[in-house]
Amino acid sequence: MEHKMNYKKILRGGLIVAFWLVIWTLAARIIDNKLLFVSPLETLKKLVVSVCDGNFWKTVLGSTARIGAGFLFGLIIGLALAVASAKLKLIEELLSPVMKLCAAVPVASFVVILLIWWGSRFLAVSICFLVVLPIVYTNTLEGIKSFDKELLEMATVFRMPLKNRLFYIYLPSLRPFLYSALKVSLGLSWKSGVAAEVIGIPDYSIGEKLYLSKVYLDTAGVFAWTVVVILLSVIFEKIILCLAQRALQWQPICKKPASTKQPKTEGIQLANVNKSYGDNNVLTDLTRTIASGETVILREPSGSGKTTLLRLLAGLEKPDQGTITCGRVGYLFQEDRLIAHISAVKNVALVTGDEAKAREALKQVLDAEDIDKPCEQLSGGMKRRAALVRAVESDCDVLLLDEPFNGLDDESREKVEKYMKERQNGRSMVIASHI
């Protein structure tokens, strides 16, 4: 069936191309002036003659090298500046007028200015760079700003290695923005690059061939070299997008969390902890010691500060007053905070660094056929259990579990309670639960 669909798609595309070739042929016959317009056949003949010319491939390689270099420089520098702007607001503010200027100023103006400054040697490279830079920068920065803050918090709490964050959180979020930037900038780089060559006329360039065709009133030559530009642009785009797709979809083996120099802490100690949001006092003079191996269940109404306390213990928020002593934590957030496009096994292995261990742990609370499904295909209760296993299997001194039984039926809850008791392993455990 799939083969048949592909055949139909190819046939449909071929018919569309044939339709426009017929229109092109009819237009050439109606105009009937080879100085103004030539037919597809005349264009093909000229193209064959050009290909047979010994300088054809030098010309193609010369233009491809210039345009490719400009595109590559724009891509790399655009990505780097977007990351820097996301890190520091001042850089974003400083670069904002520059990027707007690059996007707004006509290419022809840049061409004239750069011709005056540098001549024609690096003109095409510079123009491609100036066209690609703002597109890549803007799209990448927008993608970085769209990162899921909850997933970033999760990665911080579990001390997820940078490599895991890069390939499982950052790049998947950036993927649609980068694809969009690449598709737009690839086409524009060829248009602007060849236009710059037409004006600068560097040796062994398609722009030079187009210019000479114009000078000698060789309309067939103009059409033939235009076809070459279109073909090169399509091939260039296919190659770059294919490489980008492979790079952005690659998922390396999960690394173990980075080792911490933080000394092992016995239990939890809170001394005169105060926390408020505006005029709302959430925690007031809270003093408590929770020993290693001890389990504390917080049964308070909603809004009483249970989640706030857990976030304080996890280091995600700071108390207004008082001190908190707490070791490394494994945190089951109020939300599941699973990476939706990968499996439950991968989600746990990203934290433990051991896929076999993650698989065995998940089998205690999930059916075997569910642990390899993408988390976006799991039910709410299944996601909750997967998130719980991630917290419990993490290398930590303290377990913080916010509503661990939310969305679970009686049978699933019984499995989870048994698993939690078996895997506590002398760690302090704080459970937040509604009354």
Positions of predicted regions on the chain:
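Helix N-cap at the start of a conserved alpha-helix in ABC-type nucleotide-binding domains
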Residues: 410-412
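Conserved ABC ATPase "signature" region
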Residues: 156, 356-370
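Conserved ABC ATPase signature
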Residues: 374-382
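Catalytic Walker B motif of ABC-type/P-loop ATPase nucleotide-binding domains
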Residues: 399-403
